[in-house]
């Protein structure tokens, strides 16, 4: 695994390359790179692309440069509005996330943003999903899980139950003002909340084990639905139907 020194060297070199690239008019640290990373944090950097320059062309060139200089491997891309995020894996399993945005739209999308060079425009921060959205996704996933159990699609049922549990935990995070994204707030939940979800893990990949995990996940969702009381009240009866043994 990568060392802190290797990560710092990669960060400094990438920033050096960016500041020497006339196509990039601004750069910033984002995520944990901006707030103070721990031993295992990855690198998150974002850049503003000059007018008249094509973001795709710049991204392709930077990909080739990182592959040559760092032996980086391109894993996947994520697009959000005009920004493209490209995720790389370097030797030592160091993850490097680079994003590129046209200059006119370059700015902070969240609280973790430290400008290194150039200028940034003021933007509205992207808000976390609403509790109604989280609850609705969890309900959808629980219904799909029960259908998969009846179809004897056991691995797919496990997939939906696990996903529903994640949204139930995200609701618990939302209620306490914790981060709801990618499980980042889960470990900050009170221990009694986490303990109450222990039985939601699928213990055996058979009908009985899946139905038990489904029932426990449903209970966990309803127990943590304080922020969507009216919606939960409308759906509680239907959710309990999912837990009947007979199809």
Question: Where do the language-model regions lie?
Answer:
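Metal-dependent nucleotidyltransferase catalytic core
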Residues: 1-22, 30-40, 47-98
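Short, positively charged
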Residues: 94-101, 107-109
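Conserved nucleotidyltransferase catalytic core and NTase-mimicking acidic/glycine-rich helix/loop elements
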Residues: 122-247
């Amino acid at each position: 695994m990568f060392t802190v020194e290797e990560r710092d060297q990669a960060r400094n070199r990438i920033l050096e390359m960016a500041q020497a690239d006339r196509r990039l008019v601004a750069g910033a640290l984002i995520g944990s790179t901006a707030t103070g990373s721990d031993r295992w944090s990855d690198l998150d950097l974002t850049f503003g692309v000059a007018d008249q320059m094509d973001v795709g062309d710049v991204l392709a060139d930077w990909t080739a440069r990182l592959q040559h200089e760092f032996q980086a491997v391109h894993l996947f891309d994520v697009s959000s509005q005009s920004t493209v995020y490209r995720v790389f894996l370097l030797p030592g399993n160091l993850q490097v996330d680079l994003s590129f945005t046209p200059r006119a739209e370059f700015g902070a999308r969240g609280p973790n943003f430290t400008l290194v060079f150039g200028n940034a425009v003021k933007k509205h921060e992207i808000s976390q999903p609403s509790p109604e959205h989280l609850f609705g996704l969890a309900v959808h996933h629980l219904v799909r899980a029960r259908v998969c159990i009846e179809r004897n699609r056991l691995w797919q049922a496990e997939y939906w139950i696990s996903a529903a549990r994640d949204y139930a935990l995200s609701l618990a995070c939302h209620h306490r003002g914790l981060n709801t994204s990618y499980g980042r707030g889960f470990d900050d939940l009170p221990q009694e909340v986490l303990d109450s979800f222990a039985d939601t893990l699928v213990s055996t990949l058979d009908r009985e084990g899946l139905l038990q995990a489904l029932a426990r996940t449903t209970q966990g969702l309803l127990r943590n639905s304080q922020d969507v009381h009216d919606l939960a009240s409308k759906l509680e009866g239907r959710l309990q139907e999912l837990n009947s043994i007979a199809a």
